[in-house]
Structure formats: structure tokens, C-alpha cells
């Protein structure tokens, strides 16, 4: 990938474009992310950078993590992530990656952990059809057939069943960057992105450009 950054989802709002049209946007506090380690082909077998984001009290980190940050000369952060960037050699340890690495009009992919919905049935979890809601029917929101009796006389693997919904890594592709506010490290993305407010998100240039 060419560029990437970690950020915190702040919430949604709406703005007006130059034609007066209302655009729903998600506000993301993107960075600053500090480079704390560089991976090289000679030492690690591949090239990448390790970045840290988000303040945290030092006493909440264990000694190995504190030592890792001390070696880089950087204050302890909450999140650590590794990116394989094309120009990782141009970045130095201690350098900050900020929101202005992206520009308005660019397309990005955003990853995050989706909101947890708890235990849900097949109608909400998989968009299954309901049964008849009247005329004497006793089948309304049940699962339905899970496998015939004599053949195959079992339930196949990966059958769509009730269960835990949400709280999984989710990526939304090809979202538009509407506006950058560099002095506040804010990126405004058209539409919604995965996760709750204050959730961690990863922004990178899109793979489908």
C-alpha cells in the first residue's frame, strides 16, 4: 500500500458541498501516528514500519512494551500497528504521520471492529424470510429447515443459524475522502464506517482504484 494511518472514529455529521447538497460524513481523528520501528529485508526478511497511536498512562503498559517505546525514544501509546508501505524507507523512527497524508477526493478503504449485536436470530443476522404472520400459522421467526430427515439426515457445515452477531473485523472499500482538516487531524469520510464511536479504525488507500 502507498499510505495508511490509524484513527479514532468520532461520530457522524453532515456537511454541504459547493452545490448545496447535504453529504452525510463520518468524522475520524486520524493520527498523529508515530513511527516506532522499521523492519528491513536484511534483518526481518521484509520491509515495513511499525506505528503507534493514542495516548495512554505509562503504568498501564507492561515492561516489554515500555522498553519497546523507550528504545524508539517515543512516549508510550495505546495502539501499535504494522504497515507495509511502498516508501517506508523515507520514514524515520520518531517521525509522525498525520491526516494530511491524504487529500480530499481520494478513495480509501477503512477497517474496524463492527458493533457487537449479541445473540441474534436468522432474520436479523442473515436476512432470512419470515413465516406467515397470520391465518393460523405457527411459524413466524423460526429458523426453518436445517437439513432433511433421511437424506442427508444432518445439518451441513456453515449452515446459516442463529448466533453471535457483530464484533468482527470489517472493511468497507472505496470510500471517498470529502474533506481534510489538518490543524485538528480530522478526516471527513462520505458515509458510514465500521465500529462504534471512539473505536479504532485503519485508513489506507483503496485497492480498487
From Swiss-Prot:
The keyword Ribosomal protein applies. Keywords: Ribonucleoprotein, Ribosomal protein, RNA-binding, rRNA-binding. GO terms for cellular component: cytosolic large ribosomal subunit. The keyword rRNA-binding applies. One of its GO terms (molecular function) is structural constituent of ribosome. One of its GO terms (biological process) is translation. Pfam families: Ribosomal_L3 (PF00297). Residues 141-163 are annotated as: Disordered. HAMAP family: Ribosomal_uL3_B. One of the primary rRNA binding proteins, it binds directly near the 3'-end of the 23S rRNA, where it nucleates assembly of the 50S subunit. PANTHER family: 50S RIBOSOMAL PROTEIN L3 (PTHR11229), LARGE RIBOSOMAL SUBUNIT PROTEIN UL3C (PTHR11229:SF16). Belongs to the universal ribosomal protein uL3 family. NCBIfam families: L3_bact. This is Large ribosomal subunit protein uL3. The gene is rplC.
Amino acid at each position: 500500500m502507498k499510505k495508511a494511518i490509524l484513527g479514532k472514529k468520532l461520530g457522524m455529521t453532515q456537511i454541504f458541498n459547493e452545490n448545496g447538497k447535504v453529504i452525510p460524513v463520518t468524522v475520524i481523528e486520524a493520527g498523529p501516528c508515530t513511527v516506532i520501528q522499521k523492519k528491513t529485508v536484511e534483518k526481518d526478511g521484509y520491509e515495513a514500519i511499525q506505528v503507534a497511536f493514542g495516548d495512554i498512562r505509562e503504568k498501564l503498559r507492561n515492561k516489554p512494551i515500555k522498553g519497546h517505546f523507550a528504545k524508539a525514544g517515543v512516549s508510550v501509546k495505546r495502539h501499535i500497528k504494522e504497515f507495509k508501505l511502498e516508501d517506508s524507507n523515507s520514514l524515520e523512527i520518531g517521525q509522525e504521520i498525520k491526516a494530511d497524508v491524504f487529500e480530499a477526493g481520494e478513495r480509501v478503504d477503512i477497517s474496524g471492529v463492527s458493533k457487537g449485536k449479541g445473540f441474534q436470530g436468522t432474520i436479523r443476522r442473515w436476512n432470512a424470510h419470515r413465516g406467515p404472520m397470520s391465518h393460523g400459522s405457527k411459524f413466524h421467526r423460526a429458523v426453518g429447515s436445517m437439513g432433511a430427515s433421511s437424506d442427508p439426515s444432518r445439518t451441513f457445515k456453515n449452515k446459516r443459524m442463529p448466533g453471535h452477531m457483530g464484533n468482527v473485523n470489517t472493511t468497507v472499500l472505496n470510500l471517498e475522502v470529502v474533506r481534510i482538516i489538518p490543524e485538528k487531524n480530522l478526516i471527513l469520510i462520505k458515509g458510514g464506517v465500521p465500529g462504534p464511536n471512539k473505536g479504532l479504525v485503519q485508513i489506507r488507500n483503496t485497492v480498487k482504484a
